[in-house]
Amino acid sequence: MEGPEIQFSEAVIDNGRFGKRTIRFETGRLAQQAAGAAMVYIDDDTALLSATTAGKQPREGFDFFPLTVDVEERMYAAGRIPGSFFRREGRPSTEAILACRLMDRPLRPAFVKGLRNEVQIVVTVLAINPDELYDVVAINASSMSTQLSGLPFSGPIGGVRVALIEDQWVAFPRHSEMEKAVFNMVVAGRVAGDDVAIMMVEAEATDNSWNLIKENGATAPTEEIVSEGLEAAKPFIKALCEAQADLAARAAKPTVEFPIFLDYQDDIFEAVNAAAAAKLTEVFQIADKQERDNASDALKDEVVSSLSSKFDGREKEISAAFRSVTKQVVRQRILKDQIRIDGRGLTDIRQLTAEVEVLPRVHGSAIFERGETQIMGVTTLNMLKMEQQIDSLSPVTRKRYMHNYNFPPYSTGETGRVGSPKRREIGHGALAERALVPVLPSREEFPYAIRQVSEALSSNGSTSMGSVCASTLSLLNAGVPLKAPVAGIAMGLVSDQVDGQTRYAALTDILGAEDAFGDMDFKVAGTSEFVTAIQLDTKLDGIPASVLAAALKQAREARLHILGVLNAAIDVPDELSEFAPRVIAVKIPVDKIGEVIGPKGKMINQIQEDTGADISIEDDGTVYIGATNGPSADAARSAINAIANPQIPEIGERYLGTVVKTTTFGAFVSLTPGKDGLLHVTELRKINDGKRVDNVDDVVSVGQKIQVEITKIDDRGKLSLSPVVAEDAAAADSAEAAEPAEAAAN
């Protein structure tokens, strides 16, 4: 019996001394009822299935393209059973959601404008080498299946991750190789003539970048180096696009004619343009956002009212045309006059304010304002056992720094759903997190779990980069010793034909309207020395790398200005808040871990109960002690040291011990945790007026503190004790006082 015909193509990525990677695209075997399906392999041991399907009818009432991208992480792909209660996959992991965004962002602009049929792309991870990162493979898989589906799609789109390792940009790096990388970028693009146009960038400095740069002399990811990385990604993207195009030419379905719903017809655009263009020019010279929005809404109502009788039943088209005319007015003013909506020049930054310690009791807090964008950052510190546990296909199983971003509807003066975070909020939190991770202190330097929350209280452009700035302030206020402060800025781009030539204008610190009416949202975060994170989204089919390089340099000037404002508010870490827990680290021999824990956890539980501290022990012998105050932490440290780093007791040493048990032949006294001695019944006579002791409990009781002296240590290390009576203690004190006096006399 003959099976289905399988067709394939391959892209071989040559990384020189780092070896070759083979990306194989295959179709014809799996998911044959989907409109388009493709299996994509990387080096034969990681396999993803991408399936693209489309609804048969357009979605009614939709004025946008209903594209859905999903990633299904199957735990069997890594030979694991899910760790959830029901032992099956549930809601998508954060990594899966971020992978969805990586695919959606370059794919969405490539669909024909006006498509209203629902399109769904589902990528399922079927097999994975734990050392591989699957997200960038998923970009290529989703592009491949969409090309095969017969949808109106201007692919192929290639995606590649390049990492700067030992001064070389390496494509498709493995997790193990990323430990030596200082910077990594996911770049997606398409072939445009003889060049590659970039459609999406997601980049960050690595966790180890600071140490690699400062201690090992690795190349810092400056704007120039990042620009080189964008150029280095182009040949890889081209090879991936060519492999996809080769398979699509042989196996793709014919493009289906789908109904296209234009936002408006030409006759309505001409009427709206004639009625509103001149007035809109005046409206968009108003600097204040609310006043400008109110004037724009009033003009829109006026235009709709005046034209509705002429274009009966086409009010939606009039509204859409009004938005298009607004966009045209704003863009032409920027390109021709170099003046923006609020009257700023292309490189001007709005008014900045920065303030720390804005909330009581929390461990760290700050507010950062840029124009009408207002972000509050709040930092919480806790024991390392509170770090996030991760159950995903990634080899990363825990995360010490957790950055959450909240965008309530009131931040834009609207109503809406509140509750669990949406994909956008997860993406913005991840971006701010990546911007700050490279400058965080190590676990050894600062043994705390850190949760950073960014509250977008007011939004008019780039709340994610505002979150980076507010977080820098808040972390320093909480006492986190950052290696360097980080600031972020959002850049925009407007491009159009002016006098027969394509002209580009890069905008610094974009407004929300400039984001909506522009062609690019380009976010750049970093220190004064290098870039720590980048995110690029575009509405165009691609942007020349030279334009992006110029925008990077423009962003650096803005970043340095913002860093000056942050440093004026707080330039060194504050003292830890009195409400923050105190965490200290103790190193003990690995073979002593069992003694500290004790049988069934008896010893460690006893220390925690006695001191009120929380204790966690790492496999390497590092013990983290957390307590609400310093004395509790110090007491726990002393108790642990007494067990794991003990001094050998000697005859004659005195201790203030605690009676832990009484027997017919005496009392056991605890000197230090794990070290007890016997106070024999005959010795108890010394504290019973020399009388015979018939019942030990009549003389001492469990829990009683008693001063004792070690009188004997037998061959097995057993300690014999004697009580220190008042006369003995006084004599000992006199002898100790006499010794320095005699020394001085001599």
Curated annotation (Swiss-Prot):
Catalytic function, reaction form: RNA(n+1) + phosphate = RNA(n) + a ribonucleoside 5'-diphosphate
UniProt subcellular location: Cytoplasm
Gene3D superfamilies, alphabetized: GHMP Kinase, N-terminal domain, K Homology domain, type 1, Nucleic acid-binding proteins
Keyword Chloroplast: no
EC number: 2.7.7.8
UniProt xrefs under SUPFAM superfamilies: Eukaryotic type KH-domain (KH-domain type I), Nucleic acid-binding proteins, Polynucleotide phosphorylase/guanosine pentaphosphate synthase (PNPase/GPSI), domain 3, Ribonuclease PH domain 2-like, Ribosomal protein S5 domain 2-like
Domain S1 motif: 652-724
Domain KH: 581-640
Entry keyword annotation includes Cytoplasm: yes
Signal sequence bounds: none
UniProt-recorded Gene Ontology molecular function terms: 3'-5'-RNA exonuclease activity; magnesium ion binding; polyribonucleotide nucleotidyltransferase activity; RNA binding
CDD domains: KH-I_PNPase (cd02393), RNase_PH_PNPase_2 (cd11364)
Cofactor(s) required, per the database record: Mg(2+)
Pfam families: KH_1, PNPase, RNase_PH, S1
A GO cellular component annotation in the UniProt record: cytosol
Chief location category: cytoplasm
TM ranges: none
Source organism, top-level taxon: Bacteria
Keywords of the record: Cytoplasm, Magnesium, Metal-binding, Nucleotidyltransferase, RNA-binding, Transferase
UniProt binding sites for Mg(2+): D515, D521
GO biological process: mRNA catabolic process; RNA processing
Family as reported in the entry's similarity comment: Belongs to the polyribonucleotide nucleotidyltransferase family.
NCBIfam families referenced in this protein's UniProt entry, alphabetically: polynuc_phos (TIGR03591), pppGpp_PNP (TIGR02696), PRK11824.1 (NF008805)
HAMAP family xref list: PNPase
Function per UniProt: Involved in mRNA degradation. Catalyzes the phosphorolysis of single-stranded polyribonucleotides processively in the 3'- to 5'-direction.
Designated name of the protein: Polyribonucleotide nucleotidyltransferase
Organism of origin: Renibacterium salmoninarum (strain ATCC 33209 / DSM 20767 / JCM 11484 / NBRC 15589 / NCIMB 2235)
